[in-house]
Amino acid sequence: MSQNTYCSPIVYINGKVIDYLESYNFSTAMNNTLQTLKLTFTNPDLENLDLFGEKIELYHNYGSLDGVPLFRGYITQISATDTKITANAQDPRLYLSGQDGITVDTTDSKNYDGMTLTQFLYSFISTEVNADSTVIGLSSLTEIDKPVYMTGIRERHQAPWNLITSTLAKAIDDSNFSEPLDYFIDINHRQTTSDILFRKKSLLADKASYIFSYFDGIVELRYKERPPHNVGVARTKDGETQRFIYGNTPSGKKAITLKGNFETPAEARKAAINKVLLDYNDTKEIDMTVSKCHGISLGTVVYINVPDDNIRGKYRVTGKTISFNNSKVTCKLKCNQKPIRVSDFINN
């Protein structure tokens, strides 16, 4: 599709079509942040409505009519001028942020010991968020390959989102030593519900789902790279330090120290290795303006086919923004770097 492909977005607030849409900006990223949507209307009637907290849906309709919304969420902020009204919204996971007073308290007498993170999330949403109606769908929520447990977690007045993300960070599938894979929290907008789910990053060795080139899909491409952490440092509870060095460090050593103490030297070393390898996958950043795949999911593996050897290859999609303004549509994708190599390991 070209950049000039027809786009006919439709916005619903509480199931009612809202006219006079002037612009919007949609953003999503693979870093456990919420999807956001900012819209501007020139509809004078909206000023008389109490829109805060109301349900909003955006159908992008780029080139064809969409069967599911690009975004579904709830309005978190409204501002108005003499001629325009701006609304900000976040996806339904905002009800796990603690802003509405729903927090998690775990004590020795009341806790989630023995539950996996997935089981806890299902139980918590069912009883605390979806008590009166389905705010966050659960039909897409399944157990992860490497379950993490809530055993021993004790928190007071903790925001559910913080507890979920910090616990999920412990889940790493390191069955492929050369490319450990972590998980992120995503939202799947279906016809009537928006379902929360855990996604594992795809192996970069997998077949690319889409190919982008300057002849097919790439409107503009920007590239930058930062030095990766090549040294991981972790400590045991008794103070023993474990270090892992990746590669021959020709440009010098850049260390990252893990928070927390580990039970054994083996656990500390394993954590240091995983941290370095996970961070290595996020040092090369590609920003592409694209004319296709506006509905692409986070974590999707794509192949960027460009003349530059340093850029050409497979990447994961780590972020997406879509902007609409006066019928002009711009879609931008963020992608991360190529896979690492087992031959680069040095065990010190």
Label every model-predicted segment.
Residues M1-T5, K110, E179-S327, Q337-D344:
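Acidic, small/polar-enriched beta strand-loop surface segments
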Residues L70, K84, R156, H229, ...:
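Short edge beta-strand segments in beta-sheet-rich domains
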Residues G101, V342-N348:
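C-terminal output/interaction extensions
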Residues L37-T40, K84-Q90, S194-L197, D287-T289, ...:
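A generic structural motif
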Residues M1, V11, L39-F41, I75, ...:
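Short low-polarity hydrophobic stretches
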Residues E54-I56, M115, T300:
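Surface-exposed loop/turn positions
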Residues M1-D105, A169-K170, S202-L221:
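Assembly/oligomerization scaffold segments
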Residues T83-Y223:
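Charged- and aromatic-enriched interaction segments used to assemble
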